[in-house]
């Protein structure tokens, strides 16, 4: 048994179980499912190089559990924890898994270990989405809820919505202009056992007028494709309840900006449905370089004005300025379509 940590080993292990420190277990899935630390997350070492987006933010403390010989990159020296530290992750400690370790630490196995598949996530969603979800789920009248993420990226926000225990059964649809993003979204949902929550996913790009062009899974534009409306595109999604194809309980636009599309928000929402937006803004105080131009930044108060003027049934519940990790300001908007 080997134990390496920057702090007291008992403290670190107990902190993992209490949910105070994230824990990455890089052992083979079969070994993980036999026995692992409570609240740890399994990504086998050979898969990590394709799953960076599933790791926590680099500044967060991370505890690593591994077997002798586990490596992220076979040509590199060092353990997985050491290889992660080289890449900038904040490694609080690590150990080589062994049942003898609990004897060495005088810790009770039955309180710290569990078996079975992964039940946790290493990453966090957009913090402002996490903040408003209790309001959203309280305001939605159905337990079978539907969410559309426009500009979904790797799908982490959607995965977080579905993976936690909330009393709502969320079905998801995902759009992104990048084929790699949709591939990652698919891989993430597959790895978490959430494939049956996907109603639809598409590689599609929207122009300034709000019209869309579809692309194949290879990232090539569909042959003979013409620009189509959002409604026409969503009509092609699979696993969508008949007669309910265009309506969602929650629409997400996170680090995505299209004013024409924002004006269509009401047409996408069920009664009592919510729009959540978090994207870059000129707040009149902070100066930053990227992204540049009005195509990628709202003016302060602009987003709220657009959705309010588009339909009198849209009620703005939150209109605030927030900040992402590097200090750049973002517009935070939560709006609801009232009956």
UniProtKB/Swiss-Prot annotation:
Residues 17-111 form the Rhodanese domain. CDD domains: AdoMet_MTases. One of its GO terms (cellular component) is cytosol. One of its GO terms (molecular function) is methyltransferase activity. It holds the Pfam family Methyltransf_23. PROSITE patterns: RHODANESE_3. This is Uncharacterized protein UNK4.09. It comes from Schizosaccharomyces pombe (strain 972 / ATCC 24843).
């Amino acid at each position: 048994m080997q134990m390496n940590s920057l702090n007291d080993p008992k403290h670190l292990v107990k902190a993992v179980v209490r949910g105070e420190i994230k824990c990455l277990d890089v052992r083979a899935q079969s070994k993980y499912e036999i026995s692992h630390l409570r609240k740890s997350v399994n990504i086998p070492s050979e898969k990590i190089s394709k799953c960076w987006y599933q790791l926590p933010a680099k500044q967060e403390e991370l505890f690593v559990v591994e077997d002798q010989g586990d490596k992220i990159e076979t040509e590199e020296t060092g353990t997985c924890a050491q290889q992660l530290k080289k890449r900038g992750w904040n490694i609080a400690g690590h150990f080589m898994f062994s049942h003898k370790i609990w004897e060495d630490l005088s810790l009770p196995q039955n309180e710290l270990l569990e078996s079975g598949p992964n039940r946790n996530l290493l990453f966090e969603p957009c913090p402002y989405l996490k903040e408003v979800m209790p309001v959203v789920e309280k305001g939605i009248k159905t337990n079978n809820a539907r969410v559309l993420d426009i500009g979904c990226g790797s799908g982490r926000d959607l995965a977080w919505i579905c993976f936690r225990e909330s009393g709502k059964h969320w079905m998801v649809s995902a759009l992104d202009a990048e084929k790699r993003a949709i591939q990652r979204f698919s891989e993430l949902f597959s790895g978490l056992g959430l494939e049956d929550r996907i109603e639809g996913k598409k590689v599609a790009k929207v122009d300034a007028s709000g019209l869309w062009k579809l692309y194949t899974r290879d990232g090539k534009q569909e042959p003979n494709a013409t620009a189509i409306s959002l409604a026409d595109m969503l009509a092609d999604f699979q696993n969508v309840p008949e007669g309910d194809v265009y309506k969602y309980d929650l629409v997400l636009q996170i680090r995505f900006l299209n004013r024409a599309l924002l004006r269509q928000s009401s047409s996408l929402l069920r009664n009592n449905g919510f729009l959540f937006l978090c994207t870059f803004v000129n707040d009149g105080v902070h100066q930053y370089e990227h992204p540049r131009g009005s195509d990628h930044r709202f003016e302060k108060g602009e987003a709220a004005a657009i959705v309010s003027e588009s339909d009198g049934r849209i009620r703005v519940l939150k209109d605030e300025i927030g900040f992402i990790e590097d200090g750049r300001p973002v517009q935070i908007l939560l709006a609801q379509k009232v009956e």
